[in-house]
Amino acid sequence: MIEITQVNASLDEAGDENTCLIVGKRVAKRILRCKDSEIKSIELHRKSIDARKKRDVHFILSFRVELTSPHLEREAVDSVSERDRSRVRAIEDDEPSFPSPVSDAPQERPVVVGAGCAGLFAALTLAKAGLKPLLIERGDPAFRRSHAIDLFLKERILDPESNIQFGLGGAGTFSDGKLNTGTKNPAHRLILETFVEAGAPRDILWDAKPHIGSDILPKVVTAISQRIEQLGGVVRYRTKLVDIRIDASGAITGIDVQSSEDAACEPIETKHLILACGHSARDIFELLKDHNVALAQKTFAMGVRIEHPQRDIDRAQYGALAGHPALGAAPYKLVAHLPNGRSVFSFCMCPGGQVVAASSEPCHLCVNGASLNARDGRNANAALLVNVTPEDLPNDDPLAGIELQRACEAAAYRLGGSNWNAPAQLVGDFLAGRASKAPGKVKPTYPLGVTWTAIDEALPQHIVESLRLGLPLLGKKLRGYDRPDAVLTGVETRSSSPITVTRDRTCHAVSTPGLYPCGEGAGYAGGIMSAATDGIRCAEALIADL
């Protein structure tokens, strides 16, 4: 296999996979000095947008080419000109795979708690290994979860167990399904291929900034859960972890679950528990603390959602080529380093998306962002965040970060009017230190409505001060970012977990053998791809322990 990188292509000649492959074959024949008949296969491996020069926005492509024989491939690589040599390399075709079925699988099922991406991929990995895992999820399957969210949006009745945070697919299902990751791992390709097999669009295999969309993700995670069941696993919904059982040596011996508030606790025996509960399962972290499971504070981030007209972001990013059908809605990623030593940064940017109601606790309001697959909404939105370090917390309690989140969410609920309206403020008013009274040209998309106010009292002072310092600096990096009528909606508190469930190199909780803390909630991931990767890692660690 040969990889060819840094192939420039115009917007008109590389709009879709087929046109990209035409470009790739033409370039491969020139660089590798081969004939059409000598190319056995060619695949588009990566596609990104180069918008550094607004007059020359174009695609950068990379391809993987297989010739008809290894000998021919070696000759082709050796014949590459000096000018192109840095763009061509021979690679091994050793794509990662799920583990094969283990011999002498134990009768006792391993248990996975949480059906977000970490839990789903942990359970799928165990199922592929023939271990028939039990996957328990406190929320609903995807279609019933959608009904619970609709009820919240229409009647303002929050279901604490089935909402934007809880249910099949976890928090990522209804927050766009972005598959960006800042790390490289061989498992990423396996995860993307699994998503495609489950119904995700093929372009996630090569798009440099892949996303699935909140309209497609429910079907995808449903298909993955069904595959787990086909392989002998069991998936149980509306099943909540209420206790863990630990023997005198500190090892896991089982768990207790509950299917409803008034149901009796059901004991489940297991010596292997993957805990992938997500960052919003605060009751689980309290349970772990009660059982003296090792926890630690970690840096997390909080702030607001900021909204701009998507057309303005497109023009700022793509210039005169904004609106070209091959480009779609423009994303952005920004950071400003401040004189006070802190930073303000964008996170989870949703092109053509909307701000969503992400609450999971009564009288505690938080927001997130989401896009459908088409990304064709009128506004762009992103979280605008500032880090909260352990030094910012009032004490060394490992749950102090959770209590700060809760305090901010309770304040946001009150500021919004105690009716699930979100507090909102215009950027110009926020910078001037005055409350807002009405929107400008940018209309907020938060679906339950907003209350115009000042958001200061819903956030720690260091975050408010940093946002005020950072917005004008970000406006210098992306034209119009600090426009006076851009909308700030509060509060964004769930971007990352404020705790770490401490584990060793073998993925065991350091205090509790048999417990495998996993994913974003445990402090080992930050998004769909890293969570899924950690799910596979923990499952492989469990398999190695058998």
What are these regions (language model features)?
Residues 1-59, 65-198, 202-546:
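Residues forming the flavin
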